[in-house]
């Protein structure tokens, strides 16, 4: 907690240094002997550019020796000159925490972008963004499913409450839309608190997200933190920690279950690579930083459940050139409890969410956790889809007529299952003209069990397109057949 007295003491203890070198976002600063600031401390320096004064925050990254430190600037360094006075704040970068952050947009430094009255307010509690993960004895050992109401997720890749979920996919397959949908569903169904960290987010996307959430009435339960694409790499590297710190307060102090959305974790890795290069470190595989695994671990280990409360994290992961062996997505895989792969070939069929049911995984899809019936139905669905995939080469060469009657039935059911795994989203209503749908898990299991049993073999494939539950299927069937 930061109080007014602590602020005053910190100002009195502030140490002055001077800038000795500026190379882009890297600033070297000299301090008096014995008064070097600690690693990760925030420093401030006044910059005048075109008669406009601004304060630039620097974060200590390295001690170089000879009373020199190397820092990363959290803002453009235009106008910064050698000899400029630098002040050590004696604390790391901090962000506001508590109910005051809900419904507002912040940058990585904790400055509110939509209500400046919240800035520099001594009555608002602030936490430093560099924190230790919970100790082992604080961790929650119980495993619980997080029901989303999205059929393909709940049935085939169930999410863990308090777990880490990765949304993998190339550009334009629907990662951000799925994240927006999850924010909406959590706010509507659970009245839960969400924190959105936009790492290297496009300004247009951030604006759209803010306006859509405001329109749908879920903004008041969400805090948004953005490190935009045009900002220095230091900002993009720290914004995920800023959002996580806000989420930790809701978990640890208010005892809430929180959802943390990070879009996009690849840009967190990318920013770390840029910072590593600026600091002069030797690059590792494919040009990434040698500290990639360590930096990812520092972030991911803080995202966890403690006794009675949780942070559930949904992380969009851009896959460069759809290459899953790239070190960035490969390093992320190791920390995840569930992976949802969004597939371009499924999106091209007009099926959304474009989740690939054969490559998406969840560690809790086992009978002891989800139950025997759920597990059995999910395996039957996967089996039918896998068999259909194996038959595609035969169909492409010889045609459907060369298949056995049993295989023809399997292919027909697989097509219905594929289409029924699609679902209209609440956030897509204005684009599709169709209302969004929330399908309870029990209804999802019932529906797919009946499809696998052949109860709907006489229904045309079109009756299953982008719908909610079986009631929607039956209504579509009546509309198509006129019965």
Curated annotation (Swiss-Prot):
GO cellular component assignments: plasma membrane; proton-transporting ATP synthase complex
Enzyme Commission designation: 7.1.2.2
Topological relation to the membrane, as annotated: Peripheral membrane protein
SMART domains cross-referenced by the UniProt entry: AAA
Subcellular location: Cell membrane
The family this protein is said to belong to: Belongs to the ATPase alpha/beta chains family.
Role according to the record: Produces ATP from ADP in the presence of a proton gradient across the membrane. The catalytic sites are hosted primarily by the beta subunits.
Subunit structure: F-type ATPases have 2 components, CF(1) - the catalytic core - and CF(0) - the membrane proton channel. CF(1) has five subunits: alpha(3), beta(3), gamma(1), delta(1), epsilon(1). CF(0) has three main subunits: a(1), b(2) and c(9-12). The alpha and beta chains form an alternating ring which encloses part of the gamma chain. CF(1) is attached to CF(0) by a central stalk formed by the gamma and epsilon chains, while a peripheral stalk is formed by the delta and b chains.
PANTHER family per UniProt: ATP SYNTHASE, ATP SYNTHASE SUBUNIT BETA, MITOCHONDRIAL
UniProt-recorded name of the protein: ATP synthase subunit beta
Source organism (scientific name): Corynebacterium glutamicum (strain ATCC 13032 / DSM 20300 / JCM 1318 / BCRC 11384 / CCUG 27702 / LMG 3730 / NBRC 12168 / NCIMB 10025 / NRRL B-2784 / 534)
């Amino acid at each position: 907690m930061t109080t007014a007295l602590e602020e005053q003491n910190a100002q009195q203890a502030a140490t002055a240094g001077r800038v000795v070198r500026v190379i882009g976002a890297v600033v070297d600063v000299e301090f008096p002997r014995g008064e070097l600031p600690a690693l990760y401390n925030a420093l401030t320096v006044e910059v005048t550019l075109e008669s406009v004064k601004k304060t630039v925050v620097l974060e200590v990254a390295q001690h170089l020796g000879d009373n020199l430190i190397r820092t990363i600037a959290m803002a453009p360094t235009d106008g910064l000159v050698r000899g400029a006075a630098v002040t050590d704040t004696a604390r790391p970068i901090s962000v506001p925490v508590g109910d005051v952050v809900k419904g507002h947009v912040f940058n990585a430094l904790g400055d509110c972008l939509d209500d400046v009255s919240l800035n520099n307010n001594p009555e608002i509690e602030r936490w430093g963004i560099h924190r230790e993960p919970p100790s082992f004895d604080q961790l929650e050992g119980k495993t619980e499913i997080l029901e989303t109401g999205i059929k393909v997720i709940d049935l085939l890749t169930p999410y863990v409450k308090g777990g880490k979920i990765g949304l993998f996919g190339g550009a334009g397959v629907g990662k951000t839309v799925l994240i927006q949908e999850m924010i909406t569903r959590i706010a509507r169904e659970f009245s839960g608190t969400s924190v959105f960290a936009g790492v290297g987010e496009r300004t247009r996307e951030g604006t759209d997200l803010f306006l859509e959430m405001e329109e749908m009435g879920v903004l008041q339960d969400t805090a948004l933190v953005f490190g935009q694409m045009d900002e220095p790499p230091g900002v993009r590297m720290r914004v995920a920690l800023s959002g996580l710190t806000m989420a930790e307060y809701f978990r640890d102090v208010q005892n809430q279950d929180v959802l943390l959305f990070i879009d996009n974790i690849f840009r967190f890795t990318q920013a770390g690579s840029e910072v590593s290069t600026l600091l002069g470190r030797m690059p590792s595989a494919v040009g990434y930083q040698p500290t990639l695994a360590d930096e990812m671990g520092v972030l991911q280990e803080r995202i966890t459940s403690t006794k009675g409360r949780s942070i559930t994290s949904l992380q969009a992961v851009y896959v460069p050139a759809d290459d899953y062996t790239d070190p960035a997505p490969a390093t992320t895989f190791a920390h995840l409890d569930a992976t949802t792969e969004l597939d371009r070939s499924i999106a091209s069929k007009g099926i959304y969410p474009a989740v690939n049911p054969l490559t998406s995984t969840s560690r809790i899809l086992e009978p002891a956790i989800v139950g025997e019936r759920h597990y059995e139905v999910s395996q039957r669905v996967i089996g039918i889809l896998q068999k259909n995939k194996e038959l595609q080469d035969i169909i492409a060469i010889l045609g459907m007529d060369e298949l056995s009657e049993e295989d023809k039935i399997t292919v027909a059911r697989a097509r219905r299952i594929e289409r029924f795994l699609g679902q209209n989203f609440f956030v897509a209503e204005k684009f599709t003209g169709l209302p969004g749908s929330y399908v309870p898990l029990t209804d999802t299991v019932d529906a797919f069990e009946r499809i696998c049993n052949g109860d709907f073999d006489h229904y045309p494939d079109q009756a299953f397109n982008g719908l909610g539950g079986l009631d929607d299927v039956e209504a579509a069937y009546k509309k198509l057949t006129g019965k």
